[in-house]
Regions:
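Short gly/ser/thr-rich secondary-structure transition/capping motifs
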Residues: 51-59
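Active-site-adjacent pocket-lining segments in enzyme domains
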Residues: 9-18, 32-42, 58-59, 63-102, ...
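Short, Lys/Arg-enriched N-terminal segments with co-localized hydrophobic residues
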Residues: 1-6
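Rossmann-fold NAD(P)-dependent oxidoreductase module
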Residues: 29
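Short N-terminal binding/cap micro-motifs at the start of the first secondary-structure element
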Residues: 18-23, 48
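Membrane-interfacial amphipathic helices and adjacent loop/beta segments
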Residues: 40, 45-51
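Hydrophobic residues within alpha-helices
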Residues: 25-26, 92
Length: 167
């Protein structure tokens, strides 16, 4: 008689121009750990990566059963502006506030927009100056380590952990 453990899943949120190679590495690690995942999108229509790969999500963000998940992964993207302005996506992310969140490359900006990084240190794969041009304020980015910051003074481990959020 095999004992089964009811393992919670990891939600993967994909959006237009997501970075395929960033999410592929994370998915491989989860697969090796036999961690179940669900890929979410705004709709069940194919989502196109920045390199042209189309992925069909397993479910829509409206069908989330939060209790079935213990974590969320947000990939980077070539252009995240439309995604940041989508309130449905921001609301989806807010639901994971008390869960583990991994935000890759530029994806931490989604967490800033969702109010999950207020006053907390984080790393994002972009220069701060570019974000001011996109409407982010100095207070939004006070604790941010960007590309230029990391070149001047590298973060030793290559990521920043703030409570339940990894950037």
């Amino acid at each position: 008689c095999e004992e089964t453990i009811d393992m919670k899943k990891t939600a993967i949120l994909l959006y237009d121009s997501f970075c395929n190679f960033e999410i592929s590495v994370a998915l491989e690690i989860l697969a090796l750990a036999e961690k179940p995942i669900t890929v979410f999108g705004i709709t069940k229509q194919a989502i196109r990566s920045e390199d042209g790969l189309s992925i069909f999500p397993d479910d829509t963000i409206d069908n989330l059963d939060l209790d079935a998940y213990d974590s969320l992964i947000l990939p980077g993207a070539m252009d995240i502006r439309e995604t940041i302005e989508n309130e449905r996506i921001v609301d989806f992310i807010k639901k994971f506030e008390k869960k583990t969140i991994g935000a890759i490359s530029i994806a931490p900006l989604l967490l800033v927009k969702a109010g999950l990084l207020n006053g907390k240190p984080f790393m994002a794969g972009i220069n701060k100056e570019e974000l001011f041009e996109e409407g982010f304020s100095e207070s939004d980015l006070t604790e941010m380590v960007g590309w230029d910051d990391n070149l001047r003074k590298p973060v030793e481990e290559g990521y920043i952990i703030t409570g339940n959020i990894i950037t």
